[in-house]
Structure formats: C-alpha cells, structure tokens
C-alpha cells in the first residue's frame, strides 16, 4: 500500500484566496491593499540535505502546497519586491525517491498568470503536467489554483523547479528538486557521506517585467540592447551587491552564505544554475572537484579546479574534507564567464565552506586564495562536456538506427509578428515564437490538429523509435544554453559551422555511451546532434534557457507521437484552466506590441495588461 507524505508550507498570503470548497466556484482573489506586507525568509541552511531521508524503492506520495505571493527581500543587501513560494527565497526543496508520486497544489496569489515547470523531469506519460503556458497548459489565473501530479519514473539525481511564465522565474520563483534511488549509481554512505545543494542565480534589482519592457525600447535596459548581467550573484539565496552603485542609503552588505560540511568526509555538492543569463565558473579554494553527475546522469568525470555551468544545468561534484580540521574555512567563488558576456564586468559571488565538528562553529572569514590555473577573463565559454569526457556510470550506447533527423537553425535577426510589424528577436527556422497562451499546442494536437504554423517552429517524430535533433547555432558569436523538455538526449556529435541533413552521413558520431543531458551549451557558429528516444508522447519545448532570450522568441517545439497524444486525456482541472479565455490572445513577451488583445476574463486575468507600459519606481538610483 502506498504511503502518503503531506508537506504543507505555511506563509503569509498577500491576497485572500477564497477556496472552491467555500463557494463551489473557481477560486477568486481579493486584491484590496495589494502591497507586499511580508518579508521573505532567506535561510541557506535548508540546502543541507539530511541523512535521515529514507532512500527506498517503496513508492509513496509526497504532497506539497505552494503559495505564490509577493514579498520584500534584500538577498544581496538591496531591498526590492520579489516573488516567493511559501514566503521562502529560494522556494522549498522537494525531495523524493524514484517511483514516488509528487503532488503540488499551486495557489497563485499574484496579479498575473503562473505555472511551474519541473526542470529535467521527463513527465513520462504526464505531458499535461510539464508546466509551460501556451505549450502544455493555460496559465494558472490570478487568484486560482492548480494541482500538478506526476510520478517520477526511471530518473534520479539533481533537478529543479521554476516558473515558466514570461521570465518571472528571475523574480524568485524557483527551488531545488532532488530525486534519490536505492539503485542510483551514486550511493550515499558508499560514494559520499554528506549531501549539500548549492543553488546559484543571477540577481537584478528591477522586476523582470521592467527589464523586458525596457529591452523592447530603442534605448534598451540601462542603455544597452543586451539583457542584464545581474546586479549580484546569489548563492543559496544570498549575495553582496555594490551598495555604492545603488544609491540607496538603506543598502547593506549581508554576510556571505555558509555551507557547513563535517570534517573527514566526502561531501556531494549539487550545483544548480537557476540564472537567467550568465554562464558561471565555480571553484572552491584548496578543494579539487570530482565531477560525478550532470543533469540527472551519474558520470565518471574529471577532477577539476573549476566547473563551468550554464543556465539550467546541474552538476554534482564531490569534495574531500579530510585535509583540514574543524573550524577551517574556504571561499567558494562563483564568477561570470566574461568570454560570452559582451560588455560584462568582472563579478564574483562568494560563499564560505566551513568545516564543522562537535565544537563551536567559527565565524571568521576565510583567508584562502584562489587556484592559480583558473580561466581568465577572455577564456572562451565552453560546456564541461566539451572540455572533458563525461561517461555515464550506467552505460547506454546510442541506438545505431534512427528513423528521422530534423534541423533547428537557431537565429537572431529581424522577424515579422502577427500584426505585420518587424522586430528584432530570436527564433528557430526563421520563426520567432509568438505564444497564444490560452491555446496550448498540446491541446491542439490532442484534438487532432497540428503545430505547424508561422507562430512556432516545430518538428514531429510520429512513431516510437529514435531520432536526431540537429541544432545549428547561427547566432554569430552568441552562445546559448538549450534545454529540451520531456526528454533526455545523448550528445553524439559537435562541430563548427552548420550541419545539413545531406552531410549527416559524413559525420563520425560518438555512439559509445555518450553523455546524457537535458540542457546543453552550444557556442555561436557551431552545431550539435542530439539522439533522442521517441517514447514519450507530448509537445515538448526546446528553448534557450537565457530567460531574456526566451521572452524574445527563442523557443521551438518537438512533437512526439501525435497519434498517441490523441488518446491521452488530461484532468478536468487542466481543461478548466482555459475556460472563458480567448484562444487568439498572446502572452507577455518582449516584442508583444498590442495591449488591446486580452483574455475575456478581464476582471482578474489580464495577461497583456497595462503593467507592461507602466513605470515602476526603484528604491535606489540607477547606475550611471
């Protein structure tokens, strides 16, 4: 018999939510006095995973409630309004075992729609739960609720969850998701003793809507057409900004976050990059990093002094704490990879790795120095899999035979929107994604329709088997991290230039246990071939995980087994998300030009509302 574990996180709601049990109708929100009243909780200690968590193959149900609200927070010393889940910044850690069913009740207390995506989880058989507005669902309306329910099948490792509505992820709606398994190649107690999460994000002092609106103007954001690098780097929710640059008298310098690790142990550090833009390089003074996982795949990897990590990627590394003594402290340094951050500034986020034991915990800052062989400011950006061999510990050679190959040409340039206006943006195959947010593509295919349109680049794998996805990054010198939903892929080939279908047979592919990932860094002017198994019917997003590029249209879809999708049925609550909405309305994006198109649910559900054009005042002066 399946057990049930219910985990309810309590928070201060900023709007009152009237439940369906009380009224018999869909929940509605009361927006009276809608200013933030709570101060978000920032507690880096929650990222130390407990050894008391039972890793078992007996499935259970793990139930959570997520209240999405606004709050005030000063994660880097500068106070701003943030979005939070259960008043936590970052949001709560989800921890489960392979085979468990995860249920998450999401209550949206914001003034705009929301959704939650479970980054890296395949959603095998539950495509309706992938959490992408306009692709797999309609957004959760303001003041309403939706329950995500799915079983974690045949996966373990390091994942995360985040909002997939516009780029509101960058405002604080994200958190770790850890899946254990007694059959995982990496075993606690054998391969490592302790488990810690290192959750890394960039942090901008303006709300994401302000940034998106500014980028749509000729002046750009702070005078630049490029997305922001970030005002600070946050590690487990804390960072240090340049208070002088903010012009705010209330700005403070909070202490760096601490990661406590026992002495004489092997500690697994799970690095998660939730950043909206930069690639980061992570290093720990005096501690080599043994790479043992990438994107949920346990690997035999190198031992390095520095790990490059792209937006959306995850890496686990093991460090040895037997060389020091209780009380020793070392700097963990996270720096921006300037080789792919044009016009960027040298920026380092710091955390303290401190050895603990049975005595008093020291509060002294480390006196350690960085490794002498770290990447320089002009070092080109490259994924760790490009520089080193990452061999999956569970060996799985790529299928020799494949049914189809499809090409996505990734481009930046001029596109034409549905109103006939030309705009600068990103896209695939000469199409910049324009999101009909109340007409999900999954629903269209379920009804027997097609994703082929001028609104989104798409490709279809009709049958069970294996196939190739070729991505040509034609964006000149601009690198991108690409994330594929619903699938893990095997990286079987890379090269410079562009690869056509005609030249595919001339490539010597690596089919012998290639690395398996779901997020991949692809340099400008290069190509990659991904081998996938087409066993998961659904409409799956393929997009750049630089959130600002996504709002500019850097998204395509991969349709797998459309015939099988026609026999799938989502829950009634999923269908009801689209009730009383306009299927022709477009969701928020950097280049959405017409504020007149709205959902018919105008009283509470204004996706293209006036906030896109309003001025939001900062609490401090802009940088010069």
Curated annotation (Swiss-Prot):
Keyword field contains Disulfide bond: yes
Biased composition (Low complexity): 592-603
Disulfide bonds: 138-578
PANTHER family (alphabetical): ADR239WP, MULTI-COPPER OXIDASE
Family label: Belongs to the multicopper oxidase family.
Residues binding Cu cation 2: 119, 162, 545
Keywords for this protein: Cell wall, Copper, Disulfide bond, Glycoprotein, Metal-binding, Oxidoreductase, Repeat, Secreted, Signal
Positions contributing to Cu cation 3 binding: 164, 485, 543
Compartment(s): Secreted; Secreted, Cell wall
Extent of the signal sequence: 1-20
One MF term in the entry's GO annotations: copper ion binding
Note on cofactor: Binds 4 Cu cations per monomer.
Top-level division of the source organism's lineage: Eukaryota
Induction or repression: Induced by copper. Transcriptional induction by copper is dependent on enhancer region II, at position -1792 to -1614 within the 5'-untranslated region.
Carbohydrate-modified residues: 242, 320, 430, 503
Keyword Disulfide bond part of the UniProt annotation: yes
InterPro entries with a match to the protein in the record: Cu-oxidase-like_N, Cu-oxidase_2nd, Cu-oxidase_C, Cu-oxidase_fam, Cupredoxin
Lineage: Eukaryota, Fungi, Dikarya, Basidiomycota, Agaricomycotina
Catalysed reaction equations from the record: 4 hydroquinone + O2 = 4 benzosemiquinone + 2 H2O
Region ranges (Disordered): 582-603
Protein name per its UniProtKB record: Laccase-1
Amino acids binding Cu cation 4: 480, 544, 549
GO cellular component: extracellular region
Residue intervals of the Plastocyanin-like domain: 69-183, 195-355, 469-562
Gene that encodes it: LAC1
Residues at which Cu cation 1 binds: 117, 483
Function according to Swiss-Prot or TrEMBL: Laccase that catalyzes the oxidation of certain aromatic compounds, including L-dopa, to quinones, which then polymerize to melanin. Able to oxidize a wide variety of aromatic diphenol and diamino groups in the ortho, meta, and para positions but not monophenolic groups such as in phenol, tyramine, or tyrosine. Plays an important role in virulence. Plays a role in dissemination to extrapulmonary sites but is not involved in pulmonary growth or in elicitation of cellular immune responses in the lung.
């Amino acid at each position: 018999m399946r057990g049930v574990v219910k985990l309810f996180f309590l928070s201060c709601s900023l709007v009152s939510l009237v439940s369906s049990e009380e009224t018999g109708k869909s929940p509605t929100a009361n927006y009276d006095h809608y200013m933030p009243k709570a101060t978000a909780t920032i507690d880096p200690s929650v990222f130390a995973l407990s050894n008391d968590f039972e890793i078992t193959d007996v499935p259970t149900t793990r139930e959570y409630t997520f209240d999405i609200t606004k709050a005030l927070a000063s994660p880097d010393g500068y106070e701003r309004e943030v979005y939070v889940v259960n008043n936590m910044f970052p949001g709560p850690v989800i921890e489960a075992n392979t085979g468990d069913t995860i249920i998450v009740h999401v209550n949206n207390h914001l003034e705009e729609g929301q959704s939650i995506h479970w980054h890296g989880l395949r959603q095998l058989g539950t495509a309706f739960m992938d959490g992408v507005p306009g692709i797999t669902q309609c957004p959760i309306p303001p003041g309403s609720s939706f329950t995500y329910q799915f079983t974690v099948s045949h996966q373990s490792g390091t994942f995360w969850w985040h909002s997939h509505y516009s780029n509101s992820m960058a405002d604080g709606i994200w958190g770790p998701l850890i899946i254990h398994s007694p059959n995982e190649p990496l075993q606690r107690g054998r391969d490592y003793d302790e488990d810690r999460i290192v959750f890394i994000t960039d942090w901008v002092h303006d709300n994401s809507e302000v940034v998106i609106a500014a980028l749509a103007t000729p002046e750009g954001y702070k005078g630049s057409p490029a997305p922001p690098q970030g005002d600070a780097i946050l590690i487990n929710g804390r960072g240090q900004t340049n208070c002088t640059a903010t012009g705010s008298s209330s700005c403070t310098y909070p202490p760096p976050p601490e990661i406590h690790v026992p002495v004489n142990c092997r500690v697994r550090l799970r690095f998660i990059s939730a950043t909206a833009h930069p690639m980061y390089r992570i290093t720990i003074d005096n501690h080599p990093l043994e790479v043992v996982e990438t994107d949920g795949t346990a690997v035999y990897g190198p031992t390095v002094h520095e790990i490059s990590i792209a937006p959306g990627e995850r890496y686990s590394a093991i460090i040895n704490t037997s060389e020091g003594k209780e009380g020793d402290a070392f700097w963990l340094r996270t720096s921006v990879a300037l080789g792919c951050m044009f016009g960027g500034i040298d920026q380092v986020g710091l955390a303290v790795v401190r050895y603990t034991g049975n005595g008093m915990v020291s509060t002294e800052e480390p006196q350690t120095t960085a490794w002498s062989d770290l990447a320089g400011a002009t070092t080109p950006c490259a994924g760790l899999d490009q520089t080193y061999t990452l061999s999956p510990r569970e060996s799985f050679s790529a299928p020799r035979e494949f049914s189809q190959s499809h090409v996505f040409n990734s481009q930046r340039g001029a596109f034409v929107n549905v109103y006939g206006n030309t705009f600068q943006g990103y896209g695939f195959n000469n199409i910049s994604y324009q999101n009909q947010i109340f007409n999900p593509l999954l629903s269209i295919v379920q009804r027997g329709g097609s994703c082929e349109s001028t609104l989104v680049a798409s490709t279809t794998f009709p049958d069970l088997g294996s196939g190739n996805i070729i991505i040509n990054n034609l964006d000149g010198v601009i690198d991108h991290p690409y994330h594929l939903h619903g699938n893990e892929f095997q990286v079987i080939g890379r090269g410079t230039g562009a690869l056509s279908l005609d030249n595919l047979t001339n490539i010597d592919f690596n089919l012998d246990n290639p690395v398996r990932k779901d997020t991949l860094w692809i340099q400008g002017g290069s190509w990659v071939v991904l081998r996938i198994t087409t066993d998961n019917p659904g409409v799956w997003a393929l997009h750049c995980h630089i959130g600002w590029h996504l709002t500019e249209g850097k998204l395509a879809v991969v349709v797998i087994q459309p015939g099988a999708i026609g026999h799938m049925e989502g829950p009634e609550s999923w269908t009801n998300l689209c009730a009383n909405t306009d299927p022709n309305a477009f969701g928020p994006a950097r280049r959405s030009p017409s504020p007149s198109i709205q959902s018919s649910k105008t009283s509470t559900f204004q996706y293209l509302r006036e906030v896109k054009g309003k001025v939001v005042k900062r609490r401090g002066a802009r940088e010069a």
